[in-house]
């Protein structure tokens, strides 16, 4: 149980650490987004005074600017809460701050599913415990079967016998017999054997359920890891496209060939693409550690 808790703790630490990394990057992104929206707002105000933009245009950009500021404040608050949780996980003071450095993603060479399942069955402590419980029930059945045997003991007797007709002659007599209890039905022992047999069958079924569950879990974890890495590539590509679109929209607006609607739409798309990219990066990291936990290789066991 302690080793299983250690593996869960490692994954929990990784999840919280990746959440901190993601939130820290979100804050940087939100700060840059707010600065761009603030610049757009001031530029739209100037155009409104020149008669090149309507009041509706200015109010719309002002609303987007306020939303960008709200997201920034929300990200900062979430980062503060998550940092306290991370400090407590590490046994540090809740006020501890950390200099965060994103680690490289785990590069796991995926084996064939059957090989991965075999690895998990060889290393998973919960599966080993199920087998240990089954072995204990087998010993329990053997003990119950032995107790069912009648309690028989060998009895010997020796005596010297004098024959009254011949005073000088004595005879040695030996007798051998078997003694046992009178409860031939062995009712209590039979009940104990029946209970031990049921326990053995139940433990055997538990082993089978564990084996099927581990096989299903390993396949799901491998699929999740592959999907997370693929989604990260897609998210990074989409972010690059959204970034290029937002840059172009801002440039066109600045030279008078575009409107602020195009800019704000592009900024919203960039914000969404950035969130997906950061979430995909965190998922790609966490799924790697979860896969190692599922294989039983995340933490070495003594």
Across the structure, where does each feature detected by a protein language model lie?
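Bacterial Sec-pathway N-terminal export signals of envelope proteins
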Residues: 3, 94, 100-135, 197, ...
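Periplasmic alpha-helical coiled-coil/stalk elements that build and connect Gram-negative outer-membrane
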Residues: 2, 6-119, 224, 228, ...
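Small/polar, glycine/serine/threonine/aspartate-rich low-complexity segments that form flexible
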Residues: 100-113, 142, 146, 155-192, ...
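Acidic, low-complexity, intrinsically disordered peripheral segments
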Residues: 106, 211, 274-302
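Long amphipathic alpha-helical coiled-coil segments
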Residues: 87-93, 136, 143, 289-301
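Sec/SRP-type N-terminal targeting helices
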Residues: 1-6, 31-32, 56, 60, ...
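C-terminal structured "cap/appendage" subdomains that terminate the fold
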Residues: 245-283
């Amino acid at each position: 149980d302690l080793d299983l808790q250690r593996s869960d703790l490692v994954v929990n630490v990784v999840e919280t650490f990746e959440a901190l990394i993601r939130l820290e990057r979100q804050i940087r992104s939100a700060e840059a987004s707010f600065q761009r929206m603030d610049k757009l707002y001031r530029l739209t105000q100037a155009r409104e005074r020149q008669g090149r933009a309507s009041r509706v245009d200015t109010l719309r950009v002002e609303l987007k600017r306020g939303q960008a500021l709200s997201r920034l404040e929300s990200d900062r608050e979430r980062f503060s809460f998550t940092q306290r949780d991370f400090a407590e996980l590490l046994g540090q003071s809740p006020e501890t701050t950390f200099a965060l450095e994103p680690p490289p993603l785990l590069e796991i060479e995926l084996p064939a599913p059957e090989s991965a399942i075999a690895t998990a069955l060889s290393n998973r402590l919960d599966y080993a415990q199920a087998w240990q419980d089954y072995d204990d029930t087998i010993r329990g059945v053997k003990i119950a079967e032995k107790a069912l045997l009648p309690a028989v003991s060998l009895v010997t007797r020796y005596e010297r016998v004098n024959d009254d007709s011949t005073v000088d002659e004595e005879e040695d007599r030996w007798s051998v017999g078997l003694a046992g209890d009178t409860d031939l039905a062995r009712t209590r022992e039979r009940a104990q054997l029946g209970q031990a047999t049921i326990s053995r069958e139940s433990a055997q079924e538990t082993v089978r359920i564990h084996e099927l569950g581990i096989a299903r879990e390993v396949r799901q974890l491998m699929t999740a890891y592959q999907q997370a890495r693929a989604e990260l590539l897609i998210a990074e590509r989409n972010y690059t496209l959204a970034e290029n679109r937002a840059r172009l929209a801002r440039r066109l607006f600045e030279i008078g060939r575009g409107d602020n609607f195009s800019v704000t739409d592009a900024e919203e798309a960039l914000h969404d693409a950035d969130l997906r990219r950061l979430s995909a990066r965190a998922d790609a990291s966490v799924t790697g550690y979860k896969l190692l936990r599922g294989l039983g290789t995340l933490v070495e066991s003594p």
